[in-house]
């Protein structure tokens, strides 16, 4: 990652453009403050045709609400309780794939990634942050994205190996 800027969630999501493909980090690492700010932009008519990609996320998934039809399109690799009803109703799409193959979607270009919205641990003294519990497709999304928006969260656990990225 280069060109590091510290800013608010509302400012950070201004890099999202209509037609972009967004990756959200998974499970408890879903960046809720960024999701909320992105949805506010959608609600204000600033965005349309934005594709949201993620594995299973915990917490609210407001971008999957039918009020955002034409603004956000959810293309989920796994379907959790927070998006099950909208997926069953046809408002969101499910892309069946093995977890081990999710990184290939981004690296091959089969699924574009304009913006990766993630949570990371605090940086260590060498400037490395950890993806914590969300290495899965998030690592490939970070590597392939045009822009990475990271929420630094002191509660994200530091995991090593491929989870470490330089801030």
Give the ranges of each region predicted by the language model:
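Conserved alpha/beta enzyme-core scaffold
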Residues: 1-167
